[in-house]
Swiss-Prot record:
Disulfide bonds: none
Organism field: Chaerilus tricostatus
Tissue expression notes: Expressed by the venom gland.
Entry protein name: Peptide Ctri9293
Additional remarks: Shows a low ability to inhibit hepatitis C virus (HCV) infection in Huh7.5.1 cells.
Main function: Antimicrobial peptide.
Length: 67
């Protein structure tokens, strides 16, 4: 029982150290590159497709209405 408790405590501390190190690395990268550089700013580009007509939207709605 002592061995299990010691191993559990050791791995818990090891996990805490690993997560703190990961947070420090991310903070350092954010400081170096800036917060804007780490954001994906292209995710909205695919939200609107001007090539789709009203008929295309109606066809999509009928295809997806039972989904």
């Amino acid at each position: 029982m002592k061995t299990q408790t010691v191993l559990f405590s050791f791995f818990l501390v090891l996990l805490l150290v690993a997560t703190q190190t990961e947070g420090g690395i991310l903070d350092a990268l954010t400081g170096i590159l800036g917060k804007r550089a780490l954001r994906n700013q292209n995710f909205v580009d695919y939200a609107y497709d001007p090539s789709l007509s009203a008929a295309d939207w109606r066809a999509l709605e009928t295809l997806l209405e039972d989904y």
